[in-house]
Structure formats: structure tokens, C-alpha cells
Regions:
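Extracytosolic ligand-binding ectodomains
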Residues: 1-151
Length: 151
């Protein structure tokens, strides 16, 4: 699958050849454009994105509204994570009482805060302690949350 530009035609061609198989892809393929490229065969696709679906975030609808008003565009895939990353950085700068990168990095692993994407805390490798993957399928050519998997 790879990206929507390759996964869409692959999915469509497989269906046209009579291949009855699920097509599984990652975030590069997991787009609304995939439905256009794959046509009716998009029902054979299951794809994933790192993190909670915006529709499942407690503050997701409000963020979507404010984002649209500010940028005149729909929320891009990783915008909620970038939004939270800025707050993690600012929080770390405050706790370090510094803008020195070494001092900021020293306190960042101790971050514990509620963000748009959920609870933010890191393990000893720097990964989110409460990571999430969202699986999607397509119904009526619309990307739809299939399942949220908590890590």
C-alpha cells in the first residue's frame, strides 16, 4: 500500500482482477483521497494512524473548529500532536527555568500533563506511556474509526 497515490490504484486494480483480499496500510495511505483513488474497492482497506482519532479526542471537536477558523483548512493528520508538543516544550522550559536545550531536555522526561491527545507522559525511551493507534476502514467512501488500540 504505502501512500494513497500507490495504495489506491493497487486496491482498485486488485479488485478488478478478482483478488479478494484486505489491503492494509499505514498513515500515508489512510487518507480521504484513498477513497477517490480506490473507488468502490476502498471497502477492502484497513489502515492505521498513530494516536487517537480527532473524533475520539475529548477536545477534538473544539480543536477542529478553532483550527478551521484560524487556518481556513481542515485539521491535518498530526496537527494535534504538534499542538501538544509545543505545550510540552513550553512546560519543560518553565520547569527548567531556562531556554538552554540541555536543561530543557533534562526535565522533559518528567512531563506529566493533560494534552489534546490525552495524558502526556514518557517512558524511559521517550515514548508516550499511553500510546494509541487508531485503525480505520471505509464506509460509504468515508474514513471511519474501526478501533482504537491502547498500547
Amino acid at each position: 500500500g504505502g501512500m494513497d497515490a500507490t495504495g489506491g490504484p493497487l486496491t482498485k486494480q486488485a479488485a478488478e482482477l478478482g483478488i479478494k483480499a484486505k489491503v492494509v496500510g499505514g498513515d500515508g495511505m489512510c487518507t480521504e483521497k484513498l477513497a477517490e483513488l480506490a473507488g468502490e474497492a476502498v471497502v477492502n482497506v484497513t489502515c492505521s494512524e498513530a494516536g487517537m482519532a480527532l473524533s475520539k479526542m475529548a477536545q477534538g471537536a473544539d480543536f477542529q473548529k478553532r483550527y478551521k477558523e484560524r487556518f481556513n483548512s481542515d485539521v491535518q493528520i498530526y496537527a494535534p500532536f504538534t499542538y501538544d508538543a509545543v505545550y510540552v516544550l513550553v512546560d519543560s522550559m518553565k520547569r527548567a527555568n531556562s531556554t538552554d536545550p540541555a536543561k530543557i531536555l533534562a526535565v522533559m522526561p518528567d512531563t506529566k500533563m493533560q494534552g489534546l491527545v490525552g495524558n502526556i507522559a514518557f517512558d524511559n525511551k521517550g515514548d508516550m506511556k499511553e500510546g494509541v493507534i487508531t485503525l480505520y476502514d471505509f464506509k460509504d467512501k468515508k474514513k471511519t474509526v474501526l478501533e482504537v488500540i491502547k498500547m
